[in-house]
Amino acid sequence: MPQFPWTASGPPLSPSDGEQYAAKPDIKFGSEGRRWEIEMRLMSASPGGRDLSRRSLIGGGLALTLAGCNSGIEMPGAEVGAPAAPPAAAFGPTVGETLGSGPVRVGMILPLSQNGAPSPVGASMRNAAQMAIEEFAGSSVTLMIQDDRSSPDGAAQSAQAELGAGAELLLGPVYAPDVRQAASVAKAAGKPMIAFSTDATVAQPGVYLLSFLIQTYVDRIVQFAVSRGKKSFAVMAPQNDYGNVAVAEFHESAGRLNAPVAVVARYGPGEAQGAAQQVGAVSGQVDALFIPEQADAMPSVAAALASSGIKTQLLGTGVWNDARVLRLPQLQGAWFSAPDSAGFNAFSQRYRAKFSSEPARLATLSYDAVNLAGALARNPDRFSQRALTNVSGFNGVDGVFRFRADGTNERGLAVMEIDNNAATVISPAPRSFAAG
C-alpha cells in the first residue's frame, strides 16, 4: 500500500495541553491510476449534538489523509448498499456551470466576479472544487456552480436557482452579508448550507461554517498558555471588527479557565504606542500578552512593544503565520495558534501542477466542502443534522473539525513558536475530538 506525502494532523494533544480527545474520525484519500478514492469512517459515537471584511478572511481547509487502497464509506446508521438518490434527471435541468455526474445535486455559490471584474479568490475556489470532483466527489454528486457577483442579492438569486434545480445542499457563499441572504432562501426551502464566512454571527442551525473562526484560535492559545503556567493576561488589540471579536472571545476563554485579564488596551491605526504604554504599566502583573493583530500592522506594534520595554510572553492567532511577522525581532519566542501548514502545502503542490498558478488560501474550503458533500451523499441521511453534526467529526490534513448544532465549528489547531524567523510546532494539532 503506497503512502502519499499528505498526512492527517499530528498526534492528539496531551492532557498537559488542557485538552483530551477521543472518538477518532478517519478520512482517507487514496490513488488508483488517475482516480482518488476516499474512505470516511466516523467511529461509533453518539451524534453530536464575521466575515470581518472582504479583505480580512481567515482561510483553512482539510486537505485529507492519503493512502493507496480501495475504499468505501461507512457512516453511523447507514444502510450498506442503500440507493443514494433518485436519478439526477428527475430534477430537470441543472443551472450554472456543472461538474460531476453523481445522482445527488449540490449547489455551490462563489464570488466569481466583483464589480463586474473576475475575482481571483472565486476562480481559485472554483478550481479547487473541480479538483475535488475529479478526484473523488464526481461519482456521487452533480455540482452546480453559480456566481453571486460578491453581492447579497446575487447570493440569494443563486440559492434560489440551485434549489429550484434540485440542490439538496448549498456550499458557500464566502462573505457574511451574502451568507445571510442565501441562508434565508435555504432555510425557507428546508435545505442546509455549508458556508465559508469567518463571521460566526451568520451561523445558525442548518447554516454551518467550514472556515476557521476566531473563537477556535483564541480558545487554543489560551488553553495552551494556561497549561504552560501562564496565570494572568493582558490584551492589546486594534479598534476594528477583528479586534472586537477577539477580545470578547479572549475574555470568555480566560474566564472559563479562571485566568484574570489585568488590562485590555485598544488602539486605532498608528496608535499602538499608547496601548503599549498601558500594557507596560502592568507588565509586572501579567504572564502573557495577547495581540490579535493582522500581519501588515505587526511591525508598528512590535516597535511599540520594544519602546515600552515589554518582554512578557506574546500570544497571537493564525494571522501571525506570515513572513512579515516571523522575521520581527520582538516576536521571536512568541506563541500563536494555527492549522498545521503541511496540508495546505501539499494541496498547493497539486493545485499548481493542475492549474499552473498558486491557490488562494480559501481554496481548500471549497475543495473540502465538495469532498465532504461527496462522502455524505453516499448515505441515506446524507445532509441531515445528524450526519453533519456527528460528534466524531471529520479528519483532514489541516486538522480535525466538527460542526456544532448552532452552525459554528470546532477545529484542531497546533500551537507554533516563532524561532529564528520561522514557525515551529510546539504543541501538535489533535487527531481526534472528545466524545460529547
At which residue positions do the language-model features occur?
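N-terminal secretory signal peptides
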Residues: 1-68
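Bacterial signal peptide processing site
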Residues: 70-73
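Beta-alpha junction/loop-to-helix N-cap segments that form part of ligand/metal-binding clefts
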Residues: 123-124, 135, 139-201
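Periplasmic-binding protein-like
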Residues: 162-174, 194-196, 234-237, 285-298, ...
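Short beta-strand elements at the ligand-binding edges of bilobed clamshell
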Residues: 192-194, 201-223, 237, 264, ...
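An alpha-beta-alpha
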Residues: 209-266
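Extracellular/periplasmic periplasmic-binding protein-like sensory domains
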Residues: 298-367, 380
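Segments of small-molecule ligand-sensing domains
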Residues: 355-425, 436
